[in-house]
From Swiss-Prot:
Pathway(s) this gene product operates in, as recorded in its UniProt entry: tRNA modification; N(7)-methylguanine-tRNA biosynthesis
EC identifiers of the protein: 2.1.1.33
Region annotation (Disordered) ranges: 1-24
Gene Ontology CC entries for this record: nucleus; tRNA (m7G46) methyltransferase complex
Protein name: tRNA (guanine-N(7)-)-methyltransferase
Catalytic site positions: D160
Subcellular location: Nucleus
Keywords assigned: Methyltransferase, Nucleus, RNA-binding, S-adenosyl-L-methionine, Transferase, tRNA processing, tRNA-binding
Job of this protein: Catalyzes the formation of N(7)-methylguanine at position 46 (m7G46) in tRNA.
Catalytic reaction list: guanosine(46) in tRNA + S-adenosyl-L-methionine = N(7)-methylguanosine(46) in tRNA + S-adenosyl-L-homocysteine
GO molecular function: tRNA (guanine(46)-N7)-methyltransferase activity; tRNA binding
Coiled coil feature spans: none
Pfam families linked to this entry: Methyltransf_4 (PF02390)
Length: 256
């Protein structure tokens, strides 16, 4: 269902969990135990989403109250989970607008409430006005939100590996989707990928290296990037991998 203007965003921002979800008395943040949901969602299923017909219809001000005239979203965390890395991006790049895109309703509700709580806590400094979360299916509707060459950075951190061969087509990195990502990513922009599944890592590297619009950056470039250390445990999934002493597989690609 196509929604005009900022209708889709306002609906996403106004969504609340089915039960009253108290905040932590210590942190003042919403508690994840009230927002539990399955680890993954079928991206091919016919979920009911409202989405803009074109990027010009997106009402970004409903998500970024302090957005400046002409300012655009620069960073997109695709499948942002519970928003740990998204919040880190907001702290690292206060002058940039970052959006988290998450398909799971309760998880996206949590991130929206988390950001709202952080904004209240930091009302005197205006922190976290530069981050927001949107519930949508990025595999279907990404070009509805972003103009050609708009994004500087895209992040795919610990995506669903879809282990069964029959479900590989559901993986968020594939040849068709890589062309869509290239469309919304500016030349010289970066795609960051991180997973704890070696087979998925090899799949990602193979597909991106085969695509004519990407090149993998060198290890030296990756190590010099201030974002790289944050990829390992800023997200909740990454922190879990660290706790379990699991492997991390990183690959960063440049848009040609």
């Amino acid at each position: 269902m196509v929604a005009t203007g900022g209708q889709a965003q306002k609906q996403s921002q106004n969504q609340k969990p089915d039960v009253l979800s108290p905040t932590s008395a210590v942190t003042g943040l919403p508690q994840k135990r009230y927002y539990r949901q399955r680890a993954h969602s079928n991206p091919i299923a016919d979920h009911s989403f409202d989405y803009p017909a074109r990027p010009e219809d997106v009402d970004w001000r409903s998500m970024y109250p302090s957005i400046q005239q002409g300012q655009q979203v620069s960073f997109a965390d695709i499948g942002c989970g519970y928003g740990g890395f998204l919040v880190t991006l907001g702290e690292m790049f206060p002058e940039k607008l970052s959006i988290g895109m998450e398909i799971r309703v309760k998880v996206s509700d949590y991130v929206v409430d988390r950001i709202a709580a952080l904004r209240r806590k930091c009302a005197d400094t205006g922190a976290y006005q530069n981050v927001a979360c949107l519930r949508t299916n990025a595999m279907k509707y990404l070009p509805n939100y972003f103009a050609k060459g708009q994004l500087e950075k895209m992040f795919f951190l610990y995506p669903d590996p879809h282990f069964k061969r029959a479900k590989h087509k559901w993986r968020i990195i594939n040849q068709a989707l890589l062309s869509e990502y290239a469309y919304v990513l500016r030349k010289g922009g970066l795609v960051y990928t991180m997973t704890d599944v070696e087979d998925l890592h090899k799949w990602i590297v193979t597909h991106m290296e085969e695509h004519p619009l990407y090149e993998r950056i060198t290890e030296e470039e990756a190590n010099a990037d201030p974002i790289t250390p944050k990829l390992y445990q800023s997200s909740e999934e990454g922190a879990k991998v660290v706790r379990n002493k699991g492997d991390h597989f990183l690959a960063i690609f440049r848009r040609l």
